[in-house]
């Protein structure tokens, strides 16, 4: 995710820049061979706290692996990311957003806290202070309660206006 150099603007979580997509892809590509295997995908999902079954990993791989070579390359990954952040998602889009939200909502109370965000980022190998996570939450928290609800998360993930007022971990 790209660094934000303008101190007055808030960073964005959207993976719009090729280097941002490549950076996230590289986190999944544990062995650095330029492709994501089912085992690598399972490892990242496990690090995020998901107990995804082998069958579900297979379904995810099948959905993203459009050339059917058994791996996800960076182009397939980028196409998937673009589809997942489409402001007009397919009928299954909301369910997929809900699943993503639930990965962050560790205590399953329907809200993402700065503590939960910090835990997930730490599991992903990101090094952010808790106050950074508080700021990320604030930038998406439209009702000011200190948490991100599913509706706030959905709005953030489907916003394509080019508005960079959404949260991304500062680098």
UniProtKB/Swiss-Prot annotation:
Keywords carried by this UniProt record: Allergen, Calcium, Metal-binding, Repeat
CDD domains: EFh
Binding site for Ca(2+) 2: 65, 67, 69, 76
GO molecular function: calcium ion binding
Binding positions for Ca(2+) 3 per the UniProt entry: 105, 107, 109, 116
Tissue-wise expression: Expressed in pollen.
Pfam families, sorted: EF-hand_7
Ranges of residues in domain EF-hand: 16-51, 52-87, 92-127, 128-163
Cited InterPro entries: EF-hand-dom_pair, EF_Hand_1_Ca_BS, EF_hand_dom, EF_hand_pair_protein_CML-like
Subunit structure: Homodimer.
UniProt-recorded name of the protein: Calcium-binding allergen Ole e 8
């Amino acid at each position: 995710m790209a660094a934000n150099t303008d101190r007055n603007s808030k960073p964005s979580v959207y993976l719009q820049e090729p280097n941002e997509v490549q950076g996230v892809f590289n986190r999944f590509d544990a062995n650095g061979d330029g492709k994501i295997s089912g085992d690598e995908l399972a490892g990242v999902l496990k690090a995020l706290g998901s107990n995804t079954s082998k069958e579900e990993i297979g379904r995810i791989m099948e959905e993203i692996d459009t050339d059917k070579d058994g791996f996800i390359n960076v182009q397939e990954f980028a196409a998937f990311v673009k589809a997942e952040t489409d402001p007009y998602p397919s009928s299954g889009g909301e369910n997929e957003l809900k699943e993503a939200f639930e990965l962050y909502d560790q205590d399953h109370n329907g809200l993402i806290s700065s503590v939960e965000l910090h835990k997930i980022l730490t599991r992903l190998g990101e090094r952010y202070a808790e106050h950074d996570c508080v700021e990320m939450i604030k930038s998406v928290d439209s009702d000011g309660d200190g948490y991100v609800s599913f509706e706030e998360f959905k709005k953030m993930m489907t916003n394509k206006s080019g508005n960079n007022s959404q949260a991304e971990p500062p680098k």
